[in-house]
From Swiss-Prot:
InterPro entries: Globin, Globin-like_sf, Myoglobin. Nitrite binds at residue 65. Pfam families: Globin. Belongs to the globin family. This is Myoglobin. GO terms for molecular function: heme binding; metal ion binding; nitrite reductase activity; oxygen binding; oxygen carrier activity; peroxidase activity. It comes from Pusa sibirica. Monomeric.
Amino acid sequence: MGLSDGEWHLVLNVWGKWETDLAGHGQEVLIRLFKSHPETLEKFDKFKHLKSEDDMRRSFDLRKHGNTVLTALGGILKKKGHHEAELKPLAQSHATKHKIPIKYLEFISEAIIHVLHSKHPAEFGADAQAAMKKALELFRNDIAAKIKELGFHG
């Protein structure tokens, strides 16, 4: 299920566009996630009080967390599937500390695809979207396996 060199090129090319504003794009991804799947907000104690989209847009902490999420994901994507070392601590924290259901990884992947397309439509055509979906699926499958190894099946 790995990606070809051409697919990785498409993924990393559009990712390069995002790196100019990881905090802003990350905040947009989290807003999209919370609006599309309000139940996900309950897993974030420090964001539960953000009831409206305006509250979310004004939140420095949400922007900061968006940066953290996309920085970690970017580091994983740049490994082109050789991300074992990066996944272990991420799986550990998501399974034991945050207890994030595996299904939520699919939800955030959908949000990433949506925001990428809305922000960079020229660079994120059908081929790039397909490649990114494949890369995110690879990430999700690998981290889900690690999370399950830790005994968390949420």
